Amino acid sequence: MNQISSDSRQALEIASQRAELAAIIEQYCSTDGTHPTPIPGLTFFRHAAPSAAACAVVKSLFALLVQGAKRVVLADEVYEYDQRHYLITSVDLPLLAQITEASPDAPYLGLALELDARQIGELMSKMPHFLPSTATVSRGLAISEITTDILGAALRLARLVATPEAIPVLAPLIEQELLYHLLSGEQGGRLRDVAIKGSQSHQISRAIQWINQRFTEPMAIDELAGAVSMSK
């Protein structure tokens, strides 16, 4: 009997997890668009056709696709991601986003979970090896390859939409598990940025919020820097 390699087993597990998560999202989303769920901060989305590029300010979040593909542009950098990847934004960012792969037979499906700085900070306090280093903060958006641990936690969280009575008890525990795996992964540094008050990422996020609130008003760089505790 042929031995199934570890990589093959992992690929089969990811395919099974992805198929179940896609079924949950499609069952919940009867129409195209963004659909909030009963779980605070968790959103499902579905689109049956590619979209034009559109500007949006995206909150700090974790997002993954189970079907379809998307292009995200941040400044002069272009990011392509699909069902093989997850996306992390560690600050509120102005992005140009476009769904590049979707059809009625295979709609664009995915989920997004807003990142809670308090929740991440509490988890970090229990895990000393997750304490931030003095390394410089990188760009606040990144895409990495999905893992069975991350996809499995996201799937368990999504399953809870069918049992609303379990959400208050189980959702925080599953979210903590998901955050643990994200902190342990390639983009752990970006999650740590979310929890660091006064970090460069935190200041950038505050600056974007400050500008959004005063979009139609004249502003001075000195005033902006003072409002978010940044140097010019």
Q: Where do the PLM segments sit?
A:
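Alpha-helix N-cap/helix-initiation sites
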Residues: 55, 167-172
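Aromatic/histidine-rich interaction motifs
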Residues: 123-153
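Inter-domain helical "communication" segments and dimerization helices
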Residues: 126-129, 166, 188-190
